[in-house]
Amino acid sequence: MALLQISEPGLSAAPHQRRLAAGIDLGTTNSLVATVRSGQAETLPDHEGRHLLPSVVHYQQQGHTVGYAARDNAAQDTANTISSVKRMMGRSLADIQARYPHLPYRFKASVNGLPMIDTAAGLLNPVRVSADILKALAARASESLSGELDGVVITVPAYFDDAQRQGTKDAARLAGLHVLRLLNEPTAAAIAYGLDSGKEGVIAVYDLGGGTFDISILRLSRGVFEVLATGGDSALGGDDFDHLLADYIREQAGIADRSDNRVQRELLDAAIAAKIALSDADTVRVNVAGWQGEITREQFNDLISALVKRTLLACRRALKDAGVDPQDVLEVVMVGGSTRVPLVRERVGEFFGRTPLTAIDPDKVVAIGAAIQADILVGNKPDSEMLLLDVIPLSLGLETMGGLVEKVIPRNTTIPVARAQDFTTFKDGQTAMSIHVMQGERELVQDCRSLARFALRGIPPLPAGGAHIRVTFQVDADGLLSVTAMEKSTGVEASIQVKPSYGLTDGEIASMIKDSMSFAEQDVKARMLAEQKVEAARVLESLTGALTADAALLSAAERQCIDDAAAHLSAVAQGDDVDAIEQAIKNVDKQTQEFAARRMDQSVRRALKGHSVDEV
């Protein structure tokens, strides 16, 4: 198998010259930066030896702090201390407030409905906050490496949509970083473990971080990483464990007032500390807001059991998509700090029937994989044999006549990818075509997600079916989609890059996939009906034009038979009987065969008129 070179053009390092690159795990709760030194990938610590950087920014009128210093201010200045900003990326203000009604921030909407956070430093959006975190990580890397970074690979959840991915790239650009690539977090973990273990076969990457959950099923073979399927939830993570435990402590302490932000932060801090302690101890003492009590691991397990079960349901769906049984999985890689929770490890082990891998620190493994990939992409390993194949989570396609969806790129297709299909005009003289880009697994437009619309104009006015429009879908390595439509005879074209303003709702992707299975039979029948109705409309449209042009070729009796057949077809096409519509179309075809032959003869005679036999 010939492998593609994935180094970017122009980035090959000169002999003996090493470029500085870093991998960044931009996490919901904590972030890390890593690099490759002396052939080994390692995360970079701060001056106090701490590798994790809390994804928290504290804003003041005269500046801001990032990380531990910012987190320490959270209880005293909650409104100006922004944490878990990753959850806000690519979402509308209404969406954020509906999902997280108890966030202690002062929100305002921008003109496009996106969130702005009112802080002492002014109105800030999630991209700006993320950029400040990235700047702190880049500064740590530059200081450790004694030079400016030539490029970075930043990891994102596999289920991040175009808006969320673009927001991440915008944040990096704002931070002054050159993004070599966005990399799915589970894929980064696979790189780290694949290089370390050298195993071949199917591996499951279970990634439960602070704010997101991802499950990826990968095949590793001879250094080739192929993602067979992905699943997960873009709004489920260890933060949810913390909030459930905080609410439980609130109930036990009898604290009814939710308006005191300081108490809110104290409760959350107590919950986080208790969760960490319960990973090693069976019981923990809690002292918060004047209340003292005891929480057991069993009580904590009861609180989070339903959430852990949700992750396993996503695992089951991903395995089904990949065509793999749990017993076929060689190893299960645990990623994310939340996988330290004993119940998580226990349930995952039971589900896959094997003890999960935790050899690499689950907090660091994603950053390490990103650093390895950055080292390759920046040109330090031009002869690397590693090829990375990501996939798109949902099918991409177009709306066609009758409200149908024509899939152009099926879900779980490896990226980057480009696919094209040819379409044609429906009406005589049609000079424009509306392109409606869809995402989803169902057969009808009403059951899929609309991504974008644009129009192709300047199509030559030809008979129906005469113009040929090639529509090309291209998904780049970051999962961003561009669609181009071109009329082949003239070369006129139009295109669009799909960047939805908001992200998918919780569970929307999983729900869309589940619905496609549940309604498969119903969808096929609906598609068959819609296709027959479109064909009926096409036949009637064509017949109307033919009768307008050449009705003189028919006798009164022949015209009556054709009109009756057309009227019958028009009537049955309003109903839902697929067979009746099909038979009515066949009847129109039968009644018009002689008419079609006469029109053909007439066209031939007109074409030959004035020409000699020799000329023919």
UniProtKB/Swiss-Prot annotation:
- A UniProt-annotated Pfam family: HSP70
What keywords were assigned to this record? Answer: ATP-binding, Chaperone, Nucleotide-binding
**Could you confirm whether the keyword Nucleotide-binding appears in this record?**
yes
Q: Provide one Gene Ontology biological process annotation.
A: iron-sulfur cluster assembly
Question: What InterPro entries does the annotation carry?
Answer: ATPase_NBD (IPR043129), Heat_shock_70_CS (IPR018181), HscA_NBD (IPR042039), HSP70_C_sf (IPR029048), HSP70_peptide-bd_sf (IPR029047), Hsp_70_fam (IPR013126), ISC_FeS_clus_asmbl_HscA (IPR010236)
Highest taxon of the lineage: Bacteria
What's a single GO MF annotation on this record? unfolded protein binding
Q: Which family does it belong to?
A: Belongs to the heat shock protein 70 family.
What is the annotated role of this protein in its UniProt record? Chaperone involved in the maturation of iron-sulfur cluster-containing proteins. Has a low intrinsic ATPase activity which is markedly stimulated by HscB. Involved in the maturation of IscU.
Write the protein's name.
Chaperone protein HscA
Organism field = Salmonella dublin (strain CT_02021853)
